[in-house]
Curated annotation (Swiss-Prot):
Gene Ontology MF terms: structural constituent of ribosome
Keyword Membrane: no
InterPro entries tied to this protein: Ribosomal_bL32, Ribosomal_bL32_bact, Ribosomal_zn-bd
Entry protein name: Large ribosomal subunit protein bL32
GO biological process: translation
Domain of life: Bacteria
Source organism of the structure: Streptococcus sanguinis (strain SK36)
Amino acid sequence: MAVPARRTSKAKKNKRRTHYKVTAPTVTFDETTGDYSRSHRVSLKGYYKGRKIAKAAAAE
């Protein structure tokens, strides 16, 4: 079983992790419903590309 020969230092570990970044989700304005929604996904009111395709989610 392979084991590291040397312990990875905090600096080395943190330099490697500098590329792990959180990006903001892409949000578009839906003119049909007047709400903002994520791209390429059905809105909460059941619309996709301006067409009704699903029943709206029930409010609990």
